[in-house]
């Protein structure tokens, strides 16, 4: 097969389901190298793009961190990175790739703080999930980092999927400000970043265990929505602030100051019909806003940063404003060591069976 034209190989591989593509890697060295190239993932999923998910049989294209009431086991998403999800299902934790139906159970018994975090909605932002590709392999390694907030000092508990330990690294900020509630950490260039209420940032590198305090300042105006993200086009942290009329995008400059990069007129929303709205996602290419009208399902509006226009991304059945923890998921064929294909998950493990059912139910 390695003697075939590359466009023909692509045509064959793109017609296969994700599991079959993974199996094809085992047939010869050429295919293993070809499929392992990160560019293959990018090209294969270029027409699919990134998505938002929530676990619901009614709306399979979005995922939220809120409890899934469809089944007996509550399901939460704690993180999303490089095509993998960190899931809490009935108190059991998994790293899963919903596009390949592969997953790996995690032992969390050694953690001293994870349970306290996941049982409190306002502490969900304390969990960081970092995924990196192992060089020259399709496998990825991951680390889970729980940040411990102690007045002006911060500590870090780390897991590589096998064990938990408290890092020797601590950092003390120069000012008192709490971590921004319900604001997910951003993983950028090997470092996890946690936003604080005053606009400053706690940064931690899971690999080197080095931490630093970024003394940036941002004063949030009343009646504004705030969203912490990264601009993938320029590899910089971004802060999106918006009202019903206008949305402003700021990027973190090298001098540790938030610089205004873009101002956008918000999508038109009828005030008399509007129940609530929120910022959902930003990646430098797209900005997603959720609008909920009274007695109607919610609508996701997407703004194309290059075309400078609004469009409709989809709808959601969620009616509560509290359901705001959406996660961007970029399709990938990669997997982590010791994960399992769904058919190999023991049927006697109810949480694992539930995970399998959830992934299948969501059309992946």
Predicted regions and their residues:
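Short, conserved recognition motifs on repeat-domain binding surfaces
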Residues: 1-364
């Amino acid at each position: 097969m390695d003697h075939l034209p590359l466009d023909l190989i692509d045509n064959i591989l793109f017609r296969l389901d994700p599991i079959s593509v993974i199996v094809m890697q085992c047939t010869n060295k050429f295919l293993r190298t070809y499929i392992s190239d990160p560019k293959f993932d990018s090209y294969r999923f270029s027409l699919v793009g990134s998505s938002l998910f929530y676990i619901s049989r009614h709306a399979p294209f979005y995922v939220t961190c809120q409890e899934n009431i469809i089944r007996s086991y509550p399901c939460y998403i704690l993180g999303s990175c490089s095509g993998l999800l960190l899931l809490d299902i009935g108190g059991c934790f998994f790293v899963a790739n919903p596009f390949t139906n592969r997953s790996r159970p995690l032992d969390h018994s050694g953690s001293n703080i994870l349970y306290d975090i996941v049982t409190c909605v306002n502490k969900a932002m304390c969990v960081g999930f970092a995924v990196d590709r192992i060089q020259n392999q399709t496998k990825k390694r991951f680390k889970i980092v729980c940040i411990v907030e102690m007045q002006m000092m911060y500590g870090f508990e780390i897991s590589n999927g096998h064990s938990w330990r408290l890092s020797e690294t601590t950092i003390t900020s120069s000012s008192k400000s709490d971590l921004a509630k319900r604001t997910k950490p951003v993983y950028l260039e090997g470092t996890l970043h946690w936003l604080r209420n005053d606009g400053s940032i706690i940064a931690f590198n899971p690999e080197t265990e080095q931490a630093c305090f970024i003394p940036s300042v941002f004063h949030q105006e009343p009646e504004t929505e705030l969203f912490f993200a990264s601009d993938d086009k320029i590899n910089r942290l971004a802060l999106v602030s918006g009202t019903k009329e206008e949305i402003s995008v700021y990027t973190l400059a090298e001098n540790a100051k938030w610089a205004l990069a873009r101002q956008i007129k918000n999508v038109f929303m009828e005030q008399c019909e509007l129940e609530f709205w929120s910022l959902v996602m930003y990646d430098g290419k797209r900005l997603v806003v959720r609008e909920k009208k009274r007695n109607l399902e919610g609508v996701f509006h997407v703004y194309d940063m290059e075309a400078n226009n609004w469009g409709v991304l989809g709808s959601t059945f969620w009616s509560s404003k509290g359901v705001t923890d959406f996660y961007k998921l970029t399709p990938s064929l990669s997997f982590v060591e010791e994960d399992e294909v769904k058919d190999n998950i023991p049927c006697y493990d109810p949480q694992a069976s539930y995970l399998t059912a959830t992934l299948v139910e969501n059309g992946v």
